[in-house]
């Protein structure tokens, strides 16, 4: 079930560097591990909290007695033509730069946004008058295990674990120049 850390200080996993220890901190690497941990927590009525890279999160300095599930290691993506499919732990900065390198346009605004794609989708992250809802085609919701299209509304209990985009193909030099202007 991924990497399990006991009494892990949460300040190590947030951009604000605050937070006390979590009784258990589990880094999952794929959907099967994520499902296994969530089912375990539900079966045993254990409080759980899902995080990505910890940007825009504030944890109490008191101990968290439940399980923190980190999606940070779910960081694989692949490109098929102009369509990008990514796990939720891919960082927005990495995806923006990697897409620019191969001439895909549409993610340039993410070039300076901390955090990962899953959290970015959840809060509709954006910059430079663009946001993720403008480029996301669909996402995979753990609770329903089906693809949901971007016109649907996310509930607070939604756990994103996969995303897909349709981008525009441009000459690499144009995309890189646009990215460098940001």
Regions found by a protein language model. Give the residues of each.
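Anion-binding (especially nucleotide phosphate/pyrophosphate-binding) glycine-rich loop
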Residues: 2-117
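Phosphate/pyrophosphate- and phosphate-bearing ligand-binding catalytic cores of soluble enzymes
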Residues: 5-6, 12-18, 57, 141-182
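Glutamate identity and glutamate-enriched acidic tracts
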Residues: 8, 33-36, 72, 83, ...
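Structural signature of FAD isoalloxazine-binding scaffolds in flavoprotein oxidoreductases
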Residues: 19, 26-31, 58-75, 122-146, ...
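Short, well-ordered alpha-helical segments in soluble proteins
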Residues: 99, 117, 121-125, 171
């Amino acid at each position: 079930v991924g990497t399990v850390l006991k009494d892990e200080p949460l300040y190590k996993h947030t951009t604000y560097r605050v937070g006390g220890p979590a009784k258990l901190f589990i880094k999952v690497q794929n959907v099967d591990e994520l499902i296994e941990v969530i089912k375990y927590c539900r079966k045993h009525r254990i409080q759980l909290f899902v995080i990505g890279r910890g940007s825009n999160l504030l944890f109490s300095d008191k101990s968290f007695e439940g399980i923190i599930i980190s999606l940070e290691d779910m960081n694989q993506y692949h490109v098929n033509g102009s369509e990008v499919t990514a796990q939720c732990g891919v960082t927005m900065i990495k995806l923006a730069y990697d897409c620019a390198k191969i001439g895909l346009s549409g993610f340039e605004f993410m070039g300076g946004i901390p955090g990962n794609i899953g959290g970015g989708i959840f809060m509709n992250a954006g910059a430079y008058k663009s946001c993720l809802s403008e480029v996301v085609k669909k996402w995979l919701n753990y609770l329903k295990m089906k693809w949901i299209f971007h016109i649907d509304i996310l509930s607070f209990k939604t756990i994103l674990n996969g995303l897909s985009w349709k981008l525009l193909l441009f000459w690499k030099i144009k995309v890189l120049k646009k990215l460098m202007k940001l």
